[in-house]
Amino acid sequence: MGFDPKLEITCIDGKMKAGGLTVRTDDPTQYLRELLSSYRSPRFDYLPSFTGGLVGYFSYDYLKYSEPSVRCGEQDEDSFKDVDLMLFDKVIAFDHVRQKIVLIVNMALSDVEVGYNKAKLELEQLVSLLKTGEKKQEAPGRLLGEVTPLFSKEQFCAMVETAKHHIREGDIFQIVLSNRLSAPFEGSLLDTYRVLRTINPSPYMFYFSGTDVEVAGASPETLVKLKDGVLHTFPLAGTRPRGKTDEEDKALEESLLHDEKELAEHNMLVDLGRNDLGKVSKFGAVQVEKLHSIERYSHVMHIGSTVRGEIRDDRDALDAIEAVLPAGTLSGAPKIRACQLIGELENNKRGIYGGAIGYIDFTGNMDTCIAIRIAYKKNGRVFVRSGAGIVADSVPETEYQECINKAKAVVSALTLAQEEDL
């Protein structure tokens, strides 16, 4: 848990803000790299994996800085930031296994004695706060109206048909189209996060509250992970709903693993993952460690694979994010042309959805997930977005329903959070 951020860094359309400073830039990645260079720390194995660094999100639309040919949609009525990160040098880590809290404060080494005394005082203040601090009661979240889609079933199916035309013409092989649900909303998403932990436990559970946006999510999919020079990405593509019984669940698994359309889509995205990691990996170091395993979640199951690489000496975590974002499972193949068509067909900036949520720490390591299975709130509205992979033989109505299925867990969490005493 990040506590008392030292700095919040945001960027929208090249306008970068950090604290009270505002600059114009065509390369926010380089700005972030220079910022991180001032905060370097060794890795201590006895401490939790994250001991301080940048935490937050890179939006789907962050792609425009590395690929100017991509137009990420004209409509942007909610003005989500391209990047929103907080710099934490104080961390509260809770060990669920040992039921212990670890308090971490980073200290400057320019004057060791002064830095040590300052860090010691901050730790004492943290201990005091945890023991005696007042509990801040967030206003309960509440839906104030009907959850409505951005695209009707007819509109979405028409988008699918247009995408299939581009596939038949050889323009693309696959594309991921999304739909967005939204509703008027008041209060906090913190209870929604708590419900998600119960009904949709996932590898990545997160709650993030920035200056003007709030995000709660349960993402099943890593975007890219960097640990001690080793890169990993885990493509998930191919979906079935969970069965009501073990027998039905197993039958759905067999159906998924023998579905030529789903396997073709998945294999295409594994190749795309290999290509993305290859941009920043040492020559010959990229390999597929695991292929076609079934990953089960509360409402759906997916086909999953694991791709590994070793980062080049002249590349870093920020380069890896640029190389992989957005994931092939949220864009298509070839990626750049698919993203161009997404901008034309959806004509609505995706914002946080399909971007990266996670951290880059002071040691240079990184862990980010794809921003899916999330609820995000801004300007008195809550949003849930989900997508479906379109290939040559896709059935439009089936793809529309896949978007609905993927959104169910998050919509259920929003509803349950206002009904239960949490």
Place the predicted regions along the sequence by residue:
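Extended alpha-helical targeting/anchoring segments
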Residues: M1-L422
